[in-house]
């Protein structure tokens, strides 16, 4: 039996173990998935002991999707372009980083039959998840993508020069957007009573997507629904990216990869 898992901070709420372990059992894959709640100063030891602990692959979530880059020997497109990794394959002599969130997000839009071509899009946040969503929307030919951040100066260092980045306090004309995506943990399990932004006026058929999936309806999604939006939480994205990660780990070889 080989170990896989999720590294992050304050992530006991994650549904990933259930998704992965059910899939492993159903498909007779000799993997077990567990949570690794790590502080920043524990990551070094985690990486050093991967082979000792028989870990063949792991996912990465908040706040380490960018931190993990320094430990990788190879980063596969589009993760290299995004600058954030959420899936790592452990081979005998190297660590390979991928971004299956990218695939999961695109597949979730396909699942809900949402075509974002020519959409005006607003991304809330500027971390690893936001960068992933930006490049996915760009790939899908969204017409216009704007990013709002609590720290726009810092955010500008992470994105292409042409990207429009505003202070989250200054963007109040939300009725211009066809799609709004929350890429922050605000509204998620550790911040349930908060909203990342006020949805005062939005298009009636606007799609509001919260990458958080616990609770099923965040305060943001509840408000969006009340204002006539089509709402999506991050559950389908989580499932699709999980299946993609499993495929990569199996592709790399159950017996250590070649």
Swiss-Prot record:
Keyword annotations from UniProtKB, A to Z: Amino-acid biosynthesis, Aromatic amino acid biosynthesis, NADP, Oxidoreductase
Q: Which GO terms describe its molecular function?
A: NADP binding; shikimate 3-dehydrogenase (NADP+) activity
Could you tell me what reaction this enzyme catalyses? shikimate + NADP(+) = 3-dehydroshikimate + NADPH + H(+)
InterPro entries the record matches: Aminoacid_DH-like_N_sf, NAD(P)-bd_dom_sf, Shikimate_DH, Shikimate_DH-bd_N, Shikimate_DH_fam, Shikm_DH/Glu-tRNA_Rdtase
Single Gene Ontology BP annotation: aromatic amino acid family biosynthetic process
Instruction: Provide the residue positions that the database annotates as binding shikimate.
Output: 14-16, 61, 86, 101, 213
Pathway(s) this gene product operates in, as recorded in its UniProt entry: Metabolic intermediate biosynthesis; chorismate biosynthesis; chorismate from D-erythrose 4-phosphate and phosphoenolpyruvate: step 4/7
Keyword Flavoprotein part of the UniProt annotation: no
Record's CDD domains? Answer: NAD_bind_Shikimate_DH
Gene3D superfamilies hit by this protein: Leucine Dehydrogenase, chain A, domain 1 (3.40.50.10860), NAD(P)-binding Rossmann-like Domain (3.40.50.720)
Q: So where does NADP(+) get bound?
A: 125-129, 211, 234
What's the superkingdom here?
Answer: Bacteria
The positions flagged as active site in the entry are 65 (proton acceptor)
Q: What EC number(s) has UniProt assigned to this enzyme?
A: 1.1.1.25
Gene Ontology cellular component annotations, sorted alphabetically: cytosol
HAMAP family reported in the protein's UniProt record: Shikimate_DH_AroE
- Functional summary from the UniProt entry: Involved in the biosynthesis of the chorismate, which leads to the biosynthesis of aromatic amino acids. Catalyzes the reversible NADPH linked reduction of 3-dehydroshikimate (DHSA) to yield shikimate (SA).
Q: Family assignment?
A: Belongs to the shikimate dehydrogenase family.
Oligomeric state and interaction partners are given as: Homodimer.
State the NCBIfam families in the record.
aroE (TIGR00507)
Q: Identify this protein by name.
A: Shikimate dehydrogenase (NADP(+))
**Source taxonomy lineage?**
Bacteria, Bacillati, Bacillota, Clostridia, Eubacteriales
